[in-house]
Amino acid sequence: MSSALSPEGDRRYSDDSLSSVSTTSLVFERIQEKTEMDADNDKEKDPRALDDEDPLRDEDDLETGPFLGPGASLHREPMDRGLRRILIIVAVVFIGGWLAGLGIFIASGSYHHESDTEHDPDANSRGSGKSLSMDQLFDGTWSPKYHSISWIAGPKGEDGLLLEVGASNKPYIVVEDIRSDKNVATRDDAEPKASNSRTLMEHPYFEYDGKQYSPSWSEPSPDLTKVLLGVDRKKNWRHSFSAIYFVLDVKTQEAEPLVPDQVDARIQLASWSPKSDAVSFTRENNLYIRRLTGDKDVTQITKDGGPEYFYGIPDWVYEEEVFSGRSATWWSDDGKYLAFLRTNETGVPEYPVQFFIERPSGTTPEDGEEAYPEVEQIKYPKAGAHNPVVDLQFYDIGKKDTFSVEIDGAFADDDRIINNLLWAGDKAIVKQTNRVSDVLKVVLVDVPSRKGKTINTININEIDGGWFEISHKMTYIPADPKNGREHDGYVDSVIHEGYDHLAYFTPLDNSEPIMLTKGNWEVDDAPSAVDLANNLVYFIAAKESSIQRHVYSVKLDGSDLQALTDPKTEAYYDASFSKGAGFVFLSYRGPKVPTQKVISTPVSASSYERIIEDNAELADRARRHELPILKYGTLDLDTGVKVNYVERRPPHFDAKKQYPVLFHQYSGPGSQSVTKRFAVDFQAYVAAALGYLVITVDPRGTGFLGRKHRVTVRSKLGVHEAHDHIAAAASFASRPYVDAERLAIWGWSYGGFTTLKTLEQDAGRTFSYGMAVAPVTDWRFYDSIYTERYMRTPQDNPDGYDLSKVANATALGENKRFLLMHGVADDNVHFQNSLTLLDDLDLAGVENYDVHVFPDSDHSIYFHNGNRIVYDKLRNWLINAFNGEWLKVSNPQPQKDPVEKEKRHMVPQALV
């Protein structure tokens, strides 16, 4: 779930405002609303039935009469002539004024759906534009254009090289040197080492043995003389896939199979040697090396790979929760050694994932078995079950020898999670934790001597009682005595005084680092890059605000912290640095419309700036549409906790009215939903098009407010999160513009779990409705590595698991109604979670809910139009909830048909 679908309801706010829409248009809107409502009422069996939720209904409305029953009529007295004359005069004056106002309105041009000003999320909405639609959310209308840049290191150490694949009007794969770009201006008369672009692959296809292939994956060799090409790509799990691989010679533009004479060999992973002379690859879970020099032979490194043994690639749980990727292979920088993970799944139980509509395996069922679903058995360790046993192995390329290194005091096989490996010259730094992620060991392996030792052990229980997060940003700093670096070292994130910060460890076995950052703020998955020539470390941090991100640099001695982006301007940045850190690809993601550009770093010899994407069309679209008014703030909850929130208000927000409220959240440990990122998503649609308030709160357990805010949820997931959402809802319910009787909450994945825990804990006292998609309902059902990091094992913490389980069906029955949706083929949060909850509800006799399941859909629910159905269902269900429709079905009664009643009266009494 670390990578699980997590909605990002990040919005900006502005001050309160009254809509600038004219009185005339408001009159038209209310007339239209009333006309539509009357038309709807005409469809009812009883045309005089009153709708208590009708905002236009007035108790003094003579057309309906507040106390008139069916068949009743009004007796009207004749109107006095003097009064009639006065009313006629008033009507004439009103119509004249209305026509004059209409003329002024048309002349002003205010009716046009556009604005000359840039979309500013901090400004008050005019409410004069076009409306958002659900179709726009699904056709990409509101998706910012984001480009990805692949920086590559030059064969001779050149900086500023970009890899472009599939760019229009260019060869298919090209290496561009931005130092030769016309936008480069040299500083201090320094000459940029300009060079021409280099074509690696001319066309988006190649031929082999008379057959044409189109690659779906590519990776150039480090010396740029060859390109690995993957074709016929087939998805495996979230990150992994298999493909048929070829090696393209750049000079001749000719390709050959990676596995000689086996053109159809399906490969799970292929990686270049740093020297470009070999490729390691995993096939059928065994590891191989294909040499590209000399006899070009293939060496099989392992031989016992198969359904239960993996080499060089992760199994399901390691791919999902540890590496967030498909590789468990690491080449040493000199190409002499290959480190790889060996995973033994022998003891891991299997979970069956059923497919009722299609057969993902592509196999044809046996005769007579066509009507049976296909069942995929996945090795899935649930909390407390047997984990895969992993150990690290090394392969000596020259000696063709595989070996492992024993470490004194290492974790036992069933209590070890290997999180990361970093090559530091001919040494390897390995980070591993115990099973429940509260003890960290850093191991240093001298690979040539085949010896290793533990250089640092940290017990988090002695610090704050929390857990260690997994990070893959550890960066090697080689020694350079002439540049002030006497020894090899590395930069890594550490816990410092309750916050995540950067530290520089040197020499490699030093456990007392130089702190590079300090303070009551946190770095974000840092470092981003290191400039070795200038002893600078670049990183992204939430320094100015926990909901913003800016780019900074700091020297390796911890001095001279500088901002690369303007910290005085509210912003949320991502950054990707060139290999030498002389250039950076800056992605501004909000709060205004996102943009992207490449610039030179301040210490670069060249001054460079190039706009990659300005999203001009999106900016223009934002000017022409009614987007929500965004208001950010912090809430002081009744527990003394401060939480961030964002409130999305309708464009025509009127503080004198009362609005129903939808709370949207994710709430997972270390996550963050309240940020300054730009997004026009389902939450924006609900606020702007449906006219509801949509609020997101980041409760305890979420990220970037310090360790204390995060780790309080350990061993009892869902308890504090639910309490904070209830307290936040109660706080908003006390505001005059909030309809306290119409509060709902929804979420997906962990957000679905938190939705149910909130409804359970609240039992209808604050929230009336909830919508949960693909929720965990019992943490015993989720995977071991994620769950035990926050909950420990069920064997050690049975009470905590009971407390976190969505178990009080009776309390759920106290809510007005809730909605549950789940994909049947969810290999992440198993359908088992929803099924067991449904059984608990049945046993308790609880029926105030609706269910929709999606055959063959996984956790993201996309199969056969599933995703659109999810959001249509959320929309329609929510409208029915806030319109009071679900109150009508809570205790349904048969309608008495007057016609049938008359017929019954005509039947002889004896026959009745």
UniProtKB/Swiss-Prot annotation:
Residues that span the membrane, as ranges: 86-106
Known EC number: 3.4.14.5
Active site residues according to the UniProt entry: S749 (charge relay system), D826 (charge relay system), H859 (charge relay system)
Enzyme class at the top of the EC tree: hydrolase
Low complexity bias spans: 16-27
Keyword Glycoprotein annotated: yes
GO cellular component, one term: fungal-type vacuole membrane
Membrane topology (Cytoplasmic): 1-85
Principal location listed in the UniProt entry: membrane
Membrane topology of this protein: Single-pass type II membrane protein
GO molecular function: aminopeptidase activity; dipeptidyl-peptidase activity; serine-type peptidase activity
GO biological process: proteolysis
Key words of the record: Aminopeptidase, Glycoprotein, Hydrolase, Membrane, Protease, Serine protease, Signal-anchor, Transmembrane, Transmembrane helix, Vacuole
Pfam family of the protein (one): DPPIV_N
Subcellular location: Vacuole membrane
Positions of region (Disordered): 1-74, 892-912
Full protein name: Probable dipeptidyl-aminopeptidase B
Protein's organism: Fusarium vanettenii (strain ATCC MYA-4622 / CBS 123669 / FGSC 9596 / NRRL 45880 / 77-13-4)
